[in-house]
C-alpha cells in the first residue's frame, strides 16, 4: 500500500522505522517545522524528518491545514494529490481537519500511547504513571475530528513497573506502537478486517491526559511518599521534578524509591537520613521517600554516593 506517515518525535520515528522494513511504500512524510534546540539554538529537524531524509522520502512541513487560509488549503490539496491508500499518524502535533482525515482511501490511523478511552490527549504516558495505573498500552484507532475520539481497531497491553519513568515507559510503548501498526497494516485485507471490526469508544470511561506544565513538577512534601515517587517518575525526562531551594535555584530530582527509613514526628520535607541509598525525606501521612538521583543548578545528575560526598544537604534540614 501507499502510505503517508505523519509524526514528529522519537515515539513516531520508531513506528516509521518499522514501516520502512515492510513491503509498503512510504510515499511522503509529514512532520512539524524544524525547531531551535540545544545550547546553540540551531534549527534542528525532528527525529521523523531525519529518518525520512536518510531514506530519501519526500518531507512536508506545513504550519497547519486550515482551509480558511491559502496555505492551509494548499497543504490539503498537496496531500490529496499524493493519492495515499492510508495515512499513519503518531504524535504529529498538528490538528487534522475532517477534509484531511477523509483524503486517503482508508482514512487516517493513529498510534496512541494509552488504552483508550482512558488518557485521551497530550500526556498519556506521564498521567498513567502519576495516577498509579498498573497497566497501559497502545491503541490503533481510525481518526475522527475530536481529540482521540476515533473508533478503536487494535490494542496491545503493557504493565507499568514500579521503577518505570516516563522515559522508560515511552520506549516500551514506542516499540509496541511500531509492532501494532505493522500488524494492522500487514496487508490490505488485514487492514480491511480491522476496519470492519472496529469498536466505538465508551464515552463514560473517558479520562483526559492534560498537557504537562512545569509548575506541576515542584515536589509537594505534604503528599504521601507513594504519590511523590509517582510524580518524580512521571516527570522524568520532562519537566523533571524539582525542589525550589530559593527564588532562583531549584534542585532537580531525577529518581527515587520508597524509603525503608522512618522517624517519629518528622516534619514533611525533613531530611531524616543520608546514606548509600540516597537522601531520605519525610512526606505526608508519616511516609518517607529516598531521593536517589538529584541535580544542582549548573551541575550534572548525581547518584546517591555523589550526593553524600557534596555535603550540600544535611540531616535535619527542611526542604521547601
Curated annotation (Swiss-Prot):
GO molecular function, one term: methionyl-tRNA formyltransferase activity
GO CC, one annotated term: cytosol
EC supergroup of this enzyme: transferase
Superkingdom of source: Bacteria
Keywords: Protein biosynthesis, Transferase
Name of the protein this chain belongs to: Methionyl-tRNA formyltransferase
Coiled coil residues, start to end: none
Classification via InterPro entries: Fmt, Formyl_trans_C, Formyl_trans_C_sf, Formyl_transf_N, Formyl_transf_N_sf, Formyl_transferase-like_C_sf, Met-tRNA-FMT_C, Met-tRNA-FMT_N
Annotated positions binding (6S)-5,6,7,8-tetrahydrofolate: 114-117
EC number per UniProt: 2.1.2.9
Catalytically driven reaction(s): L-methionyl-tRNA(fMet) + (6R)-10-formyltetrahydrofolate = N-formyl-L-methionyl-tRNA(fMet) + (6S)-5,6,7,8-tetrahydrofolate + H(+)
Species for this entry: Acinetobacter baumannii (strain AB0057)
Name of the coding gene: fmt
Stated family: Belongs to the Fmt family.
Amino acid at each position: 500500500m501507499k502510505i503517508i506517515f505523519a509524526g514528529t518525535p522519537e515515539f513516531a520515528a520508531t513506528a516509521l522505522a518499522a514501516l520502512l522494513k515492510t513491503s509498503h511504500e512510504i510515499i511522503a512524510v509529514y512532520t512539524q517545522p524544524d525547531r531551535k534546540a540545544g545550547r546553540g539554538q540551531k534549527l534542528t529537524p525532528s527525529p521523523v524528518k531525519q529518518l525520512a531524509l536518510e531514506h530519501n522520502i519526500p518531507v512536508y512541513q506545513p504550519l497547519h491545514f486550515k482551509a480558511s487560509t491559502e496555505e492551509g488549503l494548499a497543504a490539503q490539496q498537496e496531500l490529496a494529490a499524493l493519492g495515499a491508500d492510508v495515512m499513519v499518524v503518531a504524535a504529529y502535533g498538528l490538528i487534522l481537519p475532517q477534509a484531511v482525515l477523509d483524503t486517503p482511501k482508508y482514512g487516517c490511523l493513529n498510534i496512541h500511547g494509552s488504552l483508550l478511552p482512558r488518557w485521551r490527549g497530550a500526556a498519556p504516558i506521564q498521567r498513567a504513571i502519576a495516577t498509579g495505573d498498573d497497566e497501559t498500552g497502545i491503541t490503533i484507532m481510525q481518526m475522527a475530528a475530536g481529540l482521540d475520539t476515533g473508533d478503536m481497531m487494535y490494542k496491545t497491553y503493557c504493565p507499568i513497573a514500579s521503577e518505570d519513568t516516563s522515559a522508560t515507559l515511552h520506549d516500551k510503548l514506542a516499540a509496541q506502537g511500531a509492532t501494532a501498526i505493522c500488524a494492522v497494516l500487514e496487508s490490505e485485507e488485514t487492514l480491511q478486517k480491522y476496519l470492519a471490526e472496529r469498536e466505538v469508544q465508551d464515552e463514560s470511561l473517558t479520562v483526559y491526559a492534560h498537557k504537562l506544565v512545569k509548575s506541576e513538577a515542584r515536589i509537594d512534601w505534604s503528599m504521601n511518599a507513594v504519590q511523590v515517587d509517582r510524580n518524580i517518575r512521571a516527570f522524568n525526562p520532562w519537566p523533571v521534578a524539582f525542589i525550589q531551594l530559593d527564588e532562583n535555584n531549584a534542585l532537580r530530582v531525577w529518581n527515587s524509591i520508597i524509603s525503608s527509613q522512618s522517624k517519629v514526628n518528622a516534619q514533611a520535607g525533613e531530611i531524616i537520613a543520608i546514606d548509600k541509598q540516597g537522601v531520605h525525606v519525610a512526606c505526608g501521612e508519616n511516609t518517607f521517600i529516598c531521593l536517589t538521583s538529584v541535580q544542582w543548578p549548573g551541575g550534572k545528575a548525581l547518584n546517591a554516593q555523589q550526593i553524600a560526598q557534596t555535603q550540600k544537604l544535611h540531616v535535619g534540614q527542611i526542604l521547601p
